[in-house]
């Protein structure tokens, strides 16, 4: 299965009538493995900030989590494994795997829990595969 198929079939899938606004699988080196059409362009410093927070949980909390220039308030995640952010009625979930970052961005009517489930389910699968 191509990386694009993982994004299209497993991240942009419908859940209870809702789906993510955009999603991507990004290598920890910053390379885009696959993304939805409208996923924002990540800046190198945004990827560095995300990786730093996974290595030292809490480093993004004071400044916020930035994805494509949009600022998200960091909310409770799982230190070293999942970063969650909130912005108005939407937000973002970032799951770290051995080699990649799985990122899902949502807006109402999708709920934070639905976004978490979609992103973390694929992330857990990739971890099981050694990716």
From Swiss-Prot:
Keywords on record: Actin-binding, Allergen, Cytoplasm, Cytoskeleton
Gene3D superfamilies per record: Dynein light chain 2a, cytoplasmic
Domain of life per record: Eukaryota
InterPro entries: PFN (IPR048278), PFN_euk (IPR005455), PFN_sf (IPR036140), Profilin_CS (IPR027310)
The UniProt record lists the keyword Kinase: no
Subunit structure: Occurs in many kinds of cells as a complex with monomeric actin in a 1:1 ratio.
GO annotations of cellular component type: cell cortex; cytoskeleton
CDD domains: PROF
Family according to the record: Belongs to the profilin family.
Name assigned to this protein: Profilin
């Amino acid at each position: 299965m191509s990386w694009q198929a993982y994004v299209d079939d497993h991240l942009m899938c419908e859940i209870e009538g809702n789906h993510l606004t955009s999603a991507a699988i990004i290598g920890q080196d910053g390379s885009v493995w696959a993304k939805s059409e409208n996923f924002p362009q990540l800046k190198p410093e945004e990827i560095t900030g995300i990786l730093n927070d996974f290595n030292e949980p809490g480093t993004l909390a004071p400044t916020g989590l930035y994805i494509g220039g949009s600022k998200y308030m960091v909310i409770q995640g799982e230190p070293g494994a999942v970063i969650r952010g909130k912005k108005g009625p939407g937000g973002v979930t970032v799951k770290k795997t051995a080699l990649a970052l799985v990122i899902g961005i949502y807006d109402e009517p999708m709920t934070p829990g639905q976004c978490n489930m979609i992103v973390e389910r694929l992330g857990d699968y990739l971890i099981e595969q050694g990716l």
